[in-house]
């Protein structure tokens, strides 16, 4: 799921050998109970008005935008995703950079971004843009996993920590950003800043899209010169033993950060 230059495939969907793979990946995740439940919470926080206009940054295939119960403008950097969301019924999707949104100031009644900031080259700029385009009093919600919170039952915890840390620090642009979002919201002068933490606990290795390729992470690190052959062999052997024994358990925390644009600008 990671390109040779270190960028995650979601940062360059249109350049991938098979862009449809990433469409399929989103569909699989949307089918998981954990994802459905926290997305319902995001909708509740937004409390969209049927007559309002809302923005989703990183709209993907448009699944969330289509069920929010209001007019939604989707933004995605990928033309593949924009076309797919339009084909599924989203009325408006714009191919654009999250750090340079093509909208006037103060036109949106609310906005959200789900699992997108972890991939952005300039996440702080993107947050500033969300604040800029919403109306005073509007709600902003950003959701991301924080891979610094990963835990895994594994016989060799030192090796597991090494592999999981590689995922957090090197397989994503902003793998541990989620824990900082509260401070960023405060610095952006948003009101009523709130953070909710939800733990994704996986007990079967084939669920959640094969846990995002967890078994392959060590070999990816090897390819970048960051892990030895011996460590990779040991990781894969122990991983297979854990799975065969029915002892697999991996977890990561998602952070739902929300706030309101002040009615009176400070």
Name each model feature, range by range.
Residues 3-29, 192-249:
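C-terminal helical/coil "lid" or tail adjacent to the Rossmann-like core of SAM-dependent
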Residues 124-139:
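A short glycine-rich, Lys/Arg-flanked "PGG" loop and its adjoining helix->strand segment in the class I
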Residues 188, 254-266:
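Core SAM-dependent methyltransferase catalytic element
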Residues 53-55, 59-100, 125:
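Class I SAM-dependent methyltransferase SAM/SAH-binding core
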Residues 112:
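A conserved beta-strand element that flanks and buttresses the S-adenosyl-L-methionine
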Residues 115-116:
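Short catalytic micro-motifs in class I SAM-dependent methyltransferases
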Residues 2-49, 63-67, 81-84:
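Conserved class I S-adenosyl-L-methionine
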Residues 141-207:
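Conserved catalytic/acceptor-binding region of the Class I
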């Amino acid at each position: 799921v990671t390109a040779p230059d270190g960028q995650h495939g979601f940062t360059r969907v249109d350049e991938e050998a098979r862009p449809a793979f990433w469409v399929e990946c989103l569909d699989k995740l949307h089918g998981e109970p954990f994802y459905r439940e926290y997305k319902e919470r995001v909708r509740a926080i937004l409390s969209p008005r049927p007559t309002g206009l809302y923005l989703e940054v990183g709209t993907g295939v448009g699944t969330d935008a289509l069920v929010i119960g209001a007019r939604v403008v989707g933004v995605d950097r990928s033309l593949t995703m924009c076309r797919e969301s339009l084909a599924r019924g989203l009325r408006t999707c714009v191919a654009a950079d999250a750090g340079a949104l093509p909208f006037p100031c103060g036109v949106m009644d609310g906005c959200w971004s789900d699992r997108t900031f972890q991939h952005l080259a300039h996440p702080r700029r993107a947050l500033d843009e969300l604040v800029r385009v919403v109306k005073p009093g509007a709600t902003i919600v950003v959701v991301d996993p924080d891979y610094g919170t990963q835990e895994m039952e594994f016989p060799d915890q030192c090796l597991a920590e090494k592999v999981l840390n590689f995922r957090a620090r090197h397989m994503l642009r902003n793998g541990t950003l989620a824990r900082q979002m509260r401070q960023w919201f405060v610095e952006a002068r948003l009101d009523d800043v709130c953070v909710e933490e939800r733990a994704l606990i996986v007990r079967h290795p084939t669920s959640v899209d094969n846990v995002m390729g967890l078994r392959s992470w060590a070999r990816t690190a090897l390819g970048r010169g960051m892990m030895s052959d011996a460590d990779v062999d040991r990781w894969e052997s122990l991983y297979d033993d854990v799975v065969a024994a029915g002892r697999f358990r991996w977890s990561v925390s998602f952070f739902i950060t929300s706030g309101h644009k002040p009615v009176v600008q400070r």
